[in-house]
Swiss-Prot record:
InterPro entries: Ribosomal_uS4, Ribosomal_uS4_CS, Ribosomal_uS4_euk/arc, Ribosomal_uS4_N, S4_RNA-bd, S4_RNA-bd_sf. The keyword Ribonucleoprotein applies. GO terms for biological process: ribosomal small subunit biogenesis; translation. Residues 169-179 have a biased composition (Basic residues). SMART domains: Ribosomal_S4, S4. Residues 166-190 are annotated as: Disordered. Pfam families: Ribosomal_S4 (PF00163), S4 (PF01479). One of its GO terms (cellular component) is ciliary plasm. Coiled coil: none annotated. Belongs to the universal ribosomal protein uS4 family. This is Small ribosomal subunit protein uS4. Keywords: Ribonucleoprotein, Ribosomal protein, RNA-binding, rRNA-binding. Residues 106-178 form the S4 RNA-binding domain.
Length: 190
């Protein structure tokens, strides 16, 4: 017998599907961050709403309440670790001020583009999906991967990638072989 997982939904569609201001805002974000569809924005929205809901709940508790101390420090550690908040912003009030672009800035696709490994955000998405990008020697093929601050400096081309130290791509190999045959074949005929 097989164990079935009941996965919860990770995104929530907007209540009003044709709200012009929201549609324009989402389209601008899709273009700016190279997103595939608006569902990626909705997924970030849901993550953000869960974090904000927890922060609001914790802010209603007294400051020395054990639950507020434990869960509040966990949320702040997570926000600092992923780079959503700066290290000097260490209060739960700052979690309420987080926005969707704050989280979209930490996606692997955006970070690869910001580091100059790709010509555009769309190019960085292609590089990631084609297994050219590695985070700390581990190839990552998910453009929506949230990059930690500690692993941000370890983003580079994969060792097996033609952009890195791997063997050259098909076109370069064909040209190299043609050049070898052209120079080597001419000597044999004479």
């Amino acid at each position: 017998m097989r164990n079935y997982n009941n996965f919860n939904r990770v995104w929530k569609a907007p209540r009003r599907p044709f709200e012009k201001e929201r549609l324009d805002r989402e389209m601008k974000l899709c273009g700016q961050y190279g997103l595939r569809c608006k569902r990626e924005i909705w997924r970030v929205n849901m993550t953000l709403s869960k974090m904000r809901r927890t922060a609001r709940l914790l802010l209603t508790l007294p400051e020395n309440h054990p639950r507020r101390l434990l869960e509040g420090s966990a949320i702040m550690r997570r926000c600092h670790g992923y780079g959503f908040l700066d290290e000097d912003k260490d209060k739960l009030d700052y979690v309420l001020s987080l926005t969707v672009p704050d989280i979209l800035e930490r996606r692997l696709q955006t970070v690869v583009f910001k580091h100059g490994l790709a010509k555009s955000v769309h190019h960085s998405r292609v590089l990631i999906q084609q297994r050219h990008i590695a985070v700390a020697k581990q190839i990552v093929t998910i453009p929506s991967f949230i990059v930690r601050v500690s692993s941000e400096h370890h983003i580079a081309f994969a060792d097996a990638s033609p952009f890195g130290n791997g063997r050259p791509g098909r076109v370069k190999r064909v040209k190299r072989n043609a050049a070898k045959k052209g120079s080597g074949g001419g000597d044999d005929d004479e």
